[in-house]
């Protein structure tokens, strides 16, 4: 490995030349003060050192340390053995570009974590070289989380993500990327963020495709964006718990006191004020179902999907399927659906929520599980599909089995299990019950 320096519109930046790619870590795309909106970085002095490990925004592990939680499944699965560095407003991104090539399509990934945790460097997706091998520039975005993002439904984290995408659009050509061929991808809360970003006109013409893993669409009563007035009572309680007389006093408290107050109050509430983006007038200008009804959300090709052991998989599938059916009904851009049902080897947790990340990013050698040839082959196929989609808006190509979008003729989702090549429409009985319950509210 050696160093590699290139010139961007912001200035020179130094990365690491690896076997199959060039890696740039921790590039700051924006600056922000606490509870203020991000300002895009347009210039830096000297040579930006992107050879060092990236910083991540404040979260649970910053203050309480996950290794002390003996029953934390996702720590054991995704983060054990890695050290993460934290900063309150670590608005940074990582870029993995091919060794050669210009005008490469660009994949921007937004990590999950319930809007309260998560990093760009987690084992399944951190700095994967698989897309660079296929001629795709891969970008992973860090953004503000929990109270530092969601305070009073102002969506600081979503604005971070939008700013990161605009920074990529303005600068990715210097990294060999094509700014006119950007696809955004997210998992879980990251997929919900992608959903929210499709509602804003600010990214129209910039984002050409979207991929949503286990989080496409929202239900009004379960994940509906709140207005600032609706969430006022919750945030007033958080400030009171912190001993702050008003918003200004709350803002001036040490970060850990702010986070602890939010964490304690949020665990006492069954509603979702503490974990959901809100109606901000810009990214989410109004209720999403109103935007969808007006047809002003971005009409671009989509990939949506679920795992068979997702959290409430029948509901998540129904939401994703409802999105696809709406596009078919209204003659919008195609939606390619998938159903991940590979039983991961190693323990009783099989196709769990986020298990598909190992396959979509190919970092299997960093996992403790005894993956088999079937798993590596399935992963290569899934990555090929995504690389094709990022390149053209269609996952098909080469010798890959045909992946049909949802249509009047094809009512199923492409099954990924390493065995079959068919389509699935699972959980039909439970989905019908949910569909009846949601009939007047509807997947959006």
PLM segments and residue spans:
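Short glycine-enriched nucleophile-adjacent loop
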Residues: 191-203
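Short beta-to-alpha linker loops that shape the active-site pocket of alpha/beta-hydrolase fold enzymes
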Residues: 143-146, 216, 341
